[in-house]
Amino acid sequence: MPPKKKVAGLIKLQIKAGQATPAPPIGPALGQHGVNIMEFCKAYNAQTESQRGNVIPVEITVYEDRSFTFITKTPPAAELIKKAAGVEKGSGEPHVKKVANLTSAQVREIAEQKLQDLNAKDVDMAARIIAGTARSMGITVSD
């Protein structure tokens, strides 16, 4: 078994799927660790091409020899909620002004999609987390 590589850093970014470019914020974040920026952009764009239009969080592990690996996550809950509710952004005053309404079925669908990234054992708990996020954005959840 080859010796394990030493980790030099962990970078977390949220990038639109299929649209990674060397421009900020990606370039400077990777450049300070000495990573080949174009190599990352090409690999990321190829892996996320099918999810175009979504913001995809990515965790990049940089090793001391300047090589890297990355893991893509599911889109942020807030992005999925905004898409399902059909709003541009959440409410400026979440508990005063309500901007949209989601059904329990929509919340459950988002919870099933996010389950692997959430700290929840089952879909019901994940749905409660998603409903809480929606409430904090000024979006009501109805049955």
UniProtKB/Swiss-Prot annotation:
One Pfam assignment: Ribosomal_L11_N
InterPro entries for this protein: Ribosomal_uL11, Ribosomal_uL11_bac-typ, Ribosomal_uL11_C, Ribosomal_uL11_C_sf, Ribosomal_uL11_CS, Ribosomal_uL11_N, Ribosomal_uL11_N_sf
CDD domains listed in its UniProt record: Ribosomal_L11 (cd00349)
UniProt entry tagged with the keyword Transport: no
Modification(s) after translation: One or more lysine residues are methylated.
Gene Ontology terms describing biological process: translation
SUPFAM superfamilies: Ribosomal L11/L12e N-terminal domain, Ribosomal protein L11, C-terminal domain
Subunit structure: Part of the ribosomal stalk of the 50S ribosomal subunit. Interacts with L10 and the large rRNA to form the base of the stalk. L10 forms an elongated spine to which L12 dimers bind in a sequential fashion forming a multimeric L10(L12)X complex.
Function of the molecule: Forms part of the ribosomal stalk which helps the ribosome interact with GTP-bound translation factors.
Protein name: Large ribosomal subunit protein uL11
Species, as recorded: Kineococcus radiotolerans (strain ATCC BAA-149 / DSM 14245 / SRS30216)
